[in-house]
Amino acid sequence: MLDARYIRENLETVEARLKTRGEGVDIALFKELDGRRRELLQQSETLKALRNKVTEEIARLQDKSQAAERKTEMREVSQQIKGIDESLRSVEEELQNFLLTVPNVPNETTPIGKSEEDNVVVRTWGEVPTLSFEPKPHWEIGEGLGILDFERGAKLAGARFTLYRGAGARLERALINYMLDLHTDEHKYIEMLPPFMVNRECMTGTGQLPKFEEDLFHMEGVDFFLIPTAEVPVTNIHRGEILKGSDLPISYVAYTPCFRKEAGSYGKDTRGLIRQHQFNKVELVKFTSPEDSYQQLQKLLGHAEEVLRRLQIPYRVVELCTGDIGFSAAKTFDIEVWLPGQNCYREISSCSCFEDFQARRAGIRFRPEEKAKPEFVHTLNGSGLAVGRTLVAVLENYQQADGSVLIPEVLRPYMGGAERIS
């Protein structure tokens, strides 16, 4: 959430930078609500100061009739204050609801653009393999090996659900454990295992609510949501807390299943594992000081890249433009993995700095020093990685002409020493 004072003092800048997202903000409504709030607040404070002053005078009055008259006047003032404060609460709630729908201001270094066509390729890693045979897409590989069952997945739950079996299930588990071990043992993240359902406050804190409720699975009868990403519960671990500056940066990693309606994806990626209602993901989350956040973003990005480097799978890093970054993000880098069966790069991780946008919504602050005034932290997160899409990348990049799939060396200890799925 943006700070109302920041918007007030930088109206033209905020409006111009939000327009680069392709979204306009009703600045006139903000000015009206903010002006009304400040006016009511001033009226309330003026009357409360008057009441306090007169109350002190009444205590010194010797004339009882005069004191009674002043008390009557103050009762009327108290009624005025009550009415003004009720109006103030109403306006503050309306302003708060408005601010919750305003996206984050893109960082000034974020490339300006309208869509993914304007994103900037930062670097590529690895050689795109030249195969001596026509590469298959992962769904054909998985079905041919009997490790992915799309038909039975649909029978169990409908479209965009998949049943993993045998070596497919074990490969998914191997990837999860490999990622967690890498991030905890070498990158020194603290592992978390959060609830897979969260309350409305969590969804509001990270920015999914109120604007994107249609893409969330909501539990009937109770006000819980299935998480769309571990970012939601892990970021909210410190909701409403004041952290020690000496503890920053705090780095968490969490494996969770993720649940998304994919409401706007009708007709997209209808085959395979790329776009599912339920999928596994290993998420990286950081809490940092404002001064350190963009340095930590590069570290987080590097940690996500390392997963693919050790798997020896080609990828590229893309910086998203203002028209393509998410609602809460100030800056985002995507990692896109090469998929031979589809002859293209596909997103496998999105690494973002949110500056204080989420922290302000969730009330996450820190003290730079022991007695210093609390400040909002900066939050960061990124996939490290999306597990299903990594499995897709393994199947397509390690496929062999005979239909088998070689197992990357780093995964073999997690696969009982097996070298091939056939």
Swiss-Prot record:
Pfam families: Seryl_tRNA_N, tRNA-synt_2b. Its EC number is 6.1.1.11. ATP binds at R260, K261, E262, E347, I348, S349, S350. InterPro entries: aa-tRNA-synt_IIb (IPR002314), aa-tRNA-synth_II (IPR006195), aa-tRNA-synth_II/BPL/LPL (IPR045864), Ser-tRNA-ligase_type_1 (IPR002317), Ser-tRNA-synth_1_N (IPR015866), SerRS_1_N_sf (IPR042103), SerRS_core (IPR033729), tRNA-bd_arm (IPR010978). It is an enzyme of class 6 (ligase). It catalyses: tRNA(Ser) + L-serine + ATP = L-seryl-tRNA(Ser) + AMP + diphosphate + H(+); tRNA(Sec) + L-serine + ATP = L-seryl-tRNA(Sec) + AMP + diphosphate + H(+). Its main location: cytoplasm. Homodimer. The tRNA molecule binds across the dimer. Catalyzes the attachment of serine to tRNA(Ser). Is also able to aminoacylate tRNA(Sec) with serine, to form the misacylated tRNA L-seryl-tRNA(Sec), which will be further converted into selenocysteinyl-tRNA(Sec). This is Serine--tRNA ligase. The gene is serS.
